[in-house]
């Protein structure tokens, strides 16, 4: 039914049905279910249609898997991922004039610049392998053009501030947050 579901529940012998979309939960990498069912990760509220006990289960296993390989080290990717989302597929959030989505809080323009992997921006951003592949491709495209060094600091600041982010003083605070995750 194209993301639109009919949810019915029997409450005190009365059927209650609601129409709605589970798309916000799916974009967050989760699955809508009744909260009496064990969740292999954590429940998030407000992302599912239906009653108040129908919540989004975002599995902790969605965080497992590996980062794409490339010029950005695995450790550096992990630090950036932790700063952006706690390294979870957190869906999309409004940030500086547009939505930022997923593990690395990737904006649509960033996804286009990295070559549009995965066929769909939001799906890619909420997939660890695809989103890290996008970050690797973005760095391969921009880090030398802007005269930035091949360092985690440059990669983090470009990720935060765009192609010339390593030279922008506005990204220094972001770099300190990445450093606090154990990267240098």
Curated annotation (Swiss-Prot):
Reported temperature dependence: Activity increases as temperature increases from 0 to 45 degrees Celsius and decreases markedly at temperatures greater than 55 degrees Celsius.
Single GO term (MF): lysozyme activity
pH-dependence of activity, as noted: Optimum pH is 5.5-6.0.
Signal sequence interval, chain numbering: 1-20
Keyword S-adenosyl-L-methionine: no
Name under which the protein is recorded: Lysozyme 1
Lineage: Eukaryota, Metazoa, Spiralia, Lophotrochozoa, Mollusca
Keyword presence, Signal: yes
Functional description taken from the UniProt entry: Has antibacterial activity against the Gram-positive bacteria L.garvieae, M.luteus and Enterococcus sp., and the Gram-negative bacteria E.coli and V.vulnificus. Weak antibacterial activity against the Gram-negative bacterium A.hydrophila. No antibacterial activity detected against the Gram-positive bacterium S.iniae or against the Gram-negative bacterium E.ictaluri. Shows some chitinase activity but no isopeptidase activity.
Species, as recorded: Crassostrea virginica
Active-site residue list: 84, 95
Protein keywords: Antibiotic, Antimicrobial, Bacteriolytic enzyme, Disulfide bond, Glycosidase, Hydrolase, Secreted, Signal
Summary of the tissues where the protein is detected: Hemolymph, labial palps, non-vesiculated cells of mantle connective tissue, cells of interlamellar junctions and epithelia surrounding the water tubes of the gills.
Matching Pfam families: Destabilase (PF05497)
Subcellular location: Secreted
Disulphide-bridged cysteine pairs: 76-152, 81-87, 92-101, 114-134, 124-130, 148-166
One GO term describing the cellular component: extracellular region
Matches recorded under SUPFAM superfamilies: Lysozyme-like
Domain I-type lysozyme: from-to ranges: 69-184
GO process annotations (BP): defense response to Gram-negative bacterium; defense response to Gram-positive bacterium; killing of cells of another organism
